[in-house]
UniProtKB/Swiss-Prot annotation:
It comes from Pseudoalteromonas atlantica (strain T6c / ATCC BAA-1087). Its main location: cytoplasm. Belongs to the DEAD box helicase family. RhlB subfamily. Component of the RNA degradosome, which is a multiprotein complex involved in RNA processing and mRNA degradation. This is ATP-dependent RNA helicase RhlB. Residues 389-421 are annotated as: Disordered. Coiled coil: none annotated.
Amino acid sequence: MQTTHLTETHFADLPINEQVVKALSAANFSHCTPIQALSLPPLLEGNDIAGQAQTGTGKTIAFLVATFHYLLSNPQPTKKQPRAIIMAPTRELAVQIFNDAELLSQHTGLSLGLIYGGEGYQSQREKLEEGVDIIIGTTGRIIDYYKQNIFSLAGIQVAVLDEADRMFDLGFIKDIRYLFNRMPKPTERLSMLFSATLSYRVQELAYEHMDNPTHVQVEPERKTGTRIKEELFYPSDEDKMALLLSLMEEEWPDKAIVFANTKHSCEKVADWLQADGHRVGLLSGDVPQNKRLKILEDFTSGKLDILVATDVAARGLHIPMVSHVFNYDLPDDAEDYVHRIGRTGRAGQSGSSISFACERYALNLPAIETYIEHAIPVTEYQADALLRDVTPPKPRHKKRMQNGRNPQKRQSSGSRNRRKP
């Protein structure tokens, strides 16, 4: 974790439980981000919060600090039943929240349970049966265990809903209401809701299940963030891949995400980058959950330098120190452009966004520039200067099942072992 001085407010200057302050200090957190400086004072006084903030603003630490502070300041004699619940729309976001929460739990003695679908059914169940103080997870699996009477929600002191707008988008709102209705009354618990937008339906949810929440809002001056350098190219279809490979060689990003609009396009990009010697991870909707988590772990730790992804990875993922975002395809939804390039330039760091307005997706550009309220600076390129001497990737083999035979597995094209001299 890095120390980022975004406000003059120090965590140590706030009336936060001493154990939590020590945990923050051990993780190199000293100064509050704007959303933390705005939300923590009312939360520390026991007031509910409905906060508007984008991913990457520090909201996770804000609600974790408030949660740990409240539980430590209001101890309960009962054991083995959860005292706080943090609900997230996706498995990846739940894992990231859990990882941040571990930094605080190591110094406070509060136990955590990570609950999400797709894997680990028995191990997660056993963890809940042992007893945890804080449940972090997705609603479907949480409800599954709840209906089996594995745990009770009667002792919940803190409830957190992260990315509430995304919950609506994914159709999880019935699950949210189901869980809220089985907790103590809003007046008997501390509740926090965070969302990228405080739409009417999100505000309605807040007033329905929270106790007169204080509204806090942090919006960047520009939707795309002033620390992100934006750049636009107009490649021909023939030059598009060569331009991407050339820019990778020229920019040599420390950590980059390349977005494409389809699974097929992502596979093509990943194959060419891998053939050129880069260390690449491919993340799309049909990648198995255990493999998705391994790819994200390797990308975060630096074992992979480039992540090629569809928009499934554009929201909710907190991956620190992403230096570059490439829009190989301009997104069909203007809002997705903001979510994509928001993966870089986080927490006071600078970042670069490079977009291709190709023959197929250039028509998406006017809507994007209208939404972000500025034109993206255009850079010209010389077609004859592009990188062309790249060994083409091996063709992908379609999976077949004939006469009981398994499909032949494609061999990896190796790791990215070149570095700038």
